[in-house]
Curated annotation (Swiss-Prot):
It is found in: Cytoplasm. Keywords: Cell cycle, Cell division, Cell shape, Cell wall biogenesis/degradation, Cytoplasm, FAD, Flavoprotein, NADP, Oxidoreductase, Peptidoglycan synthesis. Pfam families: FAD_binding_4, MurB_C. Gene3D superfamilies: 3.30.465.10, UDP-N-acetylenolpyruvoylglucosamine reductase, C-terminal domain (3.90.78.10), Uridine Diphospho-n-acetylenolpyruvylglucosamine Reductase, domain 2 (3.30.43.10). Its EC number is 1.3.1.98. This is UDP-N-acetylenolpyruvoylglucosamine reductase.
Amino acid sequence: MMMADIATAFPAIKILRDEPLAHYTHTKTGGPADYLAFPTNVQETKSLLAYANQISLPVTVVGNASNLIVRDGGIRGLVMILTQMAAITTAGNTVTAEAGAALITTTQVAQAHALSGLEFAAGIPGSVGGAIFMNAGAYGGEISTVAVAAEVLTPEGEIRTLNQAELDFGYRHSSIQDYHDIVLTATFALTPGDGAAIQAQMDDLNARRAAKQPLELPSCGSVFKRPVGHYTGQLIQEAGLQGLKWGGAQVSTKHAGFIVNIDHATATDYLELIHHIQAVILEKDGVTLETEVRIIGEEPTTQK
């Protein structure tokens, strides 16, 4: 029996065909997804994955698309954006958030319950699932210090709960990247604190972020991982690359570790600029800059 296409098979779920991912990424770049689905709960996510597996449709999962570059050729198969799964609950000293919940909102819920430990994440624009996926961090804090469990959907469709050890956190890394699990929820173990003091620390970090980072322009956040013994922004600055324009993309004049979209940039502009920076820094300083930003999708069939 011939299977219906996935959009037809799930009329109750919002599924768009040939949808430009530039509408969703924080860089405002990226080609189309063959199918873009917005599941609202675990069962819908599980059903979409099972159906896609049945018809051999590749599956890609995206959270808030903040630290992400989608190539201009887009993504074949099914892309699921989990931002409709955003419930956050508290119990005692723990906060449990669905994968699509904004990390910023999660920190605000923790503060409202006078729970300390997530202050460092107050300005990180990603989702909870994305934060687990890459062990997000800022200002000396990392998700690995507070995330004690994550409920995941395996590529085979099994729901499992991973403990902190099984999440195998490292610098901008977790086991989710190795096994291609889909994060469904994450649980954070926090410490009782003073709500006003927690808010004051969050306000301070947000002010520091606003002063140093180009928040007013589209970007993918930190482009590169910090190389041992160096500061990425400083290396780029000293190489004379700050302010360099490449198509519609530019090395931020506010913080050289960021690439901003100043004039209808394409993902290709971003990626070519990234490769240029890597080549210059390798030749000048002998330092290999690894990308922190997640890069997915296919090259365009015709280059500009």
